[in-house]
């Protein structure tokens, strides 16, 4: 497997719709204001967080069960900023919609700007032939409220191309998150 460069990412986005909408350069500021960077980087793509959030509150004192998750444990927020309570988490989604090629595995890593503030971004790998908006999980590991900015960079996608095509892709096996749009809760 080899990591793919900015040239490859740009070509795949423009010719094959791998990332939509696609920002072909790294943006660090807009209209004289600084933003957390997003867009193409040397060997990755920095994704943005959309303005849709589900903030975990557990007002119902439910047990967190991935097989039977209580959607009522979330408060829906639509805003340019999301405040995550101390020691809690929020779900969001990327602005970008992804279409991963059959011979590519995509790994997501959180941006250091957030990590240095105690905010951890978690995303599982984007498997070969998966497509959709990426559901992002933000963990606030601090004892203070934490702020997430919509429409700014939150994580970096790294694209790993295999020498050999997989036998069965995510699409082939009918993965449960195939084609997801919006913030998607756990499914079993």
UniProtKB/Swiss-Prot annotation:
Keywords, comma-separated and alphabetical: Hydrolase, Nucleotide metabolism, Nucleotide-binding
GO biological process, any: dUMP biosynthetic process
Pfam family, one: DCD
InterPro entries: dCTP_deaminase (IPR011962), dUTPase-like_sf (IPR036157), dUTPase_trimeric (IPR033704)
Binding-site residues, dCTP: 111-116, 135-137, 156, 170, 180
Catalytic residues (UniProt): 137 (proton donor/acceptor)
Coiled coil: none
GO molecular function, one term: nucleotide binding
EC identifiers of the protein: 3.5.4.13
Pathway named in the protein's UniProt entry: Pyrimidine metabolism; dUMP biosynthesis; dUMP from dCTP (dUTP route): step 1/2
CDD domains documented for this protein: trimeric_dUTPase
Reaction(s) catalysed by this chain's protein: dCTP + H2O + H(+) = dUTP + NH4(+)
Self-association state and partner proteins as the record states: Homotrimer.
Family in the record: Belongs to the dCTP deaminase family.
NCBIfam families on file: dCTP_deam
Function according to Swiss-Prot or TrEMBL: Catalyzes the deamination of dCTP to dUTP.
Protein name, UniProt field: dCTP deaminase
Source species of the chain: Pseudomonas putida (strain W619)
């Amino acid at each position: 497997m080899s990591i793919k460069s900015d040239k490859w990412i740009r070509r795949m986005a423009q010719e094959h719709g791998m990332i939509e909408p696609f920002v072909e350069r790294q943006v660090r500021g807009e209209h004289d204001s600084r933003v957390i960077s997003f867009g193409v980087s040397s060997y990755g793509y920095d994704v943005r967080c959309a303005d849709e959030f589900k903030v975990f509150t557990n007002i119902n004192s439910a047990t967190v069960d991935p097989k039977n998750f209580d959607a009522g444990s979330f408060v829906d927020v639509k805003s340019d900023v999301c405040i995550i309570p101390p020691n809690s988490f929020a779900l969001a989604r990327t602005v970008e919609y992804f279409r991963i090629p059959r011979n590519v595995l995509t790994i997501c890593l959180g941006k250091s700007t957030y990590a240095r503030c105690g905010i951890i971004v978690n995303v599982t790998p984007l498997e070969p032939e998966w497509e959709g908006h990426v559901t992002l999980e933000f963990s606030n590991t601090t004892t203070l409220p934490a702020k997430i900015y919509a429409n700014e960079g939150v994580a970096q996608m790294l694209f790993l191309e295999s020498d050999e095509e997989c036998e069965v892709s995510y699409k082939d096996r009918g993965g449960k998150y195939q084609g997801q749009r919006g913030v998607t809760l756990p499914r079993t």
